[in-house]
A protein has these predicted regions:
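Charge-rich, low-complexity N-terminal segments
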Residues: 1-145
Length: 145
């Protein structure tokens, strides 16, 4: 099992429609590649964890790095882990928009104080991503699709 945790800046201020399109495509592609993970959006910054086969995760991350919708891509942590345990279960792309209070309310999510992603270390990032993944699975389908 291989994992990458990174942050990046949103260059285009995704509309809700653009975010949904991105998530649908990402979930399809990640599912086909056996990749799981979660994406958290807050104040124009993304925080994401990807996990799965090393080659598939690295290829996905390389594609993300070339995407002009992102900048300031910074790996917070990466590496192989022993065993097949996944931190994000079966989530091909869990997602929480921490700035969207209506999404959070519709999923009965209480949001903690979300720190500036540029100041997170890998342990704090992982804790925040686990928090997001726990909330993703409880959100209604219409908030995720």
């Amino acid at each position: 099992m291989f994992q990458i945790i990174y942050r990046s800046k949103d260059n285009i201020s995704f509309s809700e429609k653009e975010l949904k399109r991105l998530l649908i495509r990402s979930r399809f592609r990640n599912g086909a590649d056996g990749i799981t993970g979660v994406l958290l959006l807050h104040e124009g910054m993304f925080l994401q964890a990807l996990e799965g086969d090393e080659a598939a995760v690295k290829a996905t991350f390389a594609r993300i790095g070339l995407d002009s919708r992102h900048s300031e891509v910074c790996i917070l942590g990466s590496g192989a882990r022993s065993g097949e345990h996944r931190n994000f279960g079966k989530l091909a792309m869990g997602f929480v928009n921490a700035g969207d209070r209506t999404q959070l309310l519709s999923g009965f999510v209480e949001i903690p104080d979300v720190p500036d992603f540029s100041k997170l270390n890998v342990l704090a990032a992982m804790e925040l991503l686990r928090w997001a993944s726990e909330r993703t699975s409880r959100m209604p389908a219409e908030a995720l699709d």
